[in-house]
């Protein structure tokens, strides 16, 4: 699947200042730049003959690498140390060690980056506040994110035709300042309660999770664990296309005109409340200090 170029970044608060995806081409380094002192945003890729100008822009703050060459990626360590934001799209690489040279990065976006599996080099970015990971084909273990104490916003995503696997969510309990957790088109590989580590996130303000991404019991757990967190108020049954769609992956539906529709919805609500009670007991036994 080719990149959508949609802007999936949460523009509330100060999490993201990276230019929207569709605007990346407005900053192409495809011709000679006359006043390099004024340049703060650039886009380069293997098609840009004048890409080396990037080293002559002393005030560069943001860089997009769109289908970059190996030479361009390896040259990142030579960039001005004022670089705060980077977006890399369509890259195959054996590792992401190159990112460690960019110590001042605050916002990092990886889209369609494949060939590597270890995210731990990101730990070297001690100012990293926002991280967007989309369609990382070789990654399933996100333990490499543990210990990024500056991280406030995390988005993990797949695509319409491929779901990003996540082995477990243990890494969450070692992201002490995380405020926003966003999960889209993902596959959970951990049995219930997969989100137990989320109890350690004392600063979490918002979660963004689709209503059919996880088993119903996981949604019940999240509601019980995060009663005051924005995004945990999913409708138990959603009015959609003449049906009531029940909350949870594979939870089913009932036609609105079905004479037993109300009974089915009431039964689901009762079941969900029982799940929340079970979750509350688990939380009492496992609450992180």
Predicted regions and their residues:
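Concave beta-strand-loop units of leucine-rich repeat
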Residues: 2-96, 101-117, 121-288
């Amino acid at each position: 699947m080719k990149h959508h170029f949609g802007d999936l970044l949460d523009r509330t608060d100060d999490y993201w200042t990276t230019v929207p995806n569709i605007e990346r081409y407005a900053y192409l380094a495809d011709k000679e730049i006359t006043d390099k002192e004024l340049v703060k945003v650039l886009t380069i890729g293997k098609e840009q003959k004048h890409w080396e100008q990037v080293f002559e822009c002393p005030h560069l703050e943001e860089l997009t690498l769109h289908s970059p060459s190996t030479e361009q990626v390896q040259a990142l360590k030579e960039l001005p140390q004022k670089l705060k934001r980077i977006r890399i799209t369509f890259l195959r690489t054996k590792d992401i060690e190159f990112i460690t040279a960019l110590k001042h990065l605050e916002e990092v976006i990886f889209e369609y980056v494949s060939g590597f599996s270890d995210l731990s080099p990101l730990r070297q970015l001690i100012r990293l506040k926002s991280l967007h990971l989309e369609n990382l084909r070789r990654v399933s273990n996100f333990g490499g994110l543990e210990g990024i104490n500056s991280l406030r916003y995390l988005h993990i995503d797949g695509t319409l035709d491929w779901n990003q696997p996540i082995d477990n969510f243990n890494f969450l309990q070692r992201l002490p300042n995380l405020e926003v957790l966003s999960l889209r088109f993902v596959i959970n590989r951990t049995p219930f309660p997969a989100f137990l580590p989320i109890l350690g996130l004392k600063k979490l303000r918002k979660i963004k999770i689709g209503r059919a991404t996880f088993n119903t019991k996981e949604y019940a757990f999240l509601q019980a664990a995060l009663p005051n967190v924005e995004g945990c108020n999913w409708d138990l049954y959603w009015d959609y296309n003449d049906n009531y769609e029940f909350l949870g992956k594979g939870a089913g539906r009932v036609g609105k005109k079905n004479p037993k529709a109300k009974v089915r919805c009431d039964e689901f609500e009762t079941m969900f409340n029982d799940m929340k009670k079970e979750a509350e007991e688990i939380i009492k036994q496992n609450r992180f200090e």
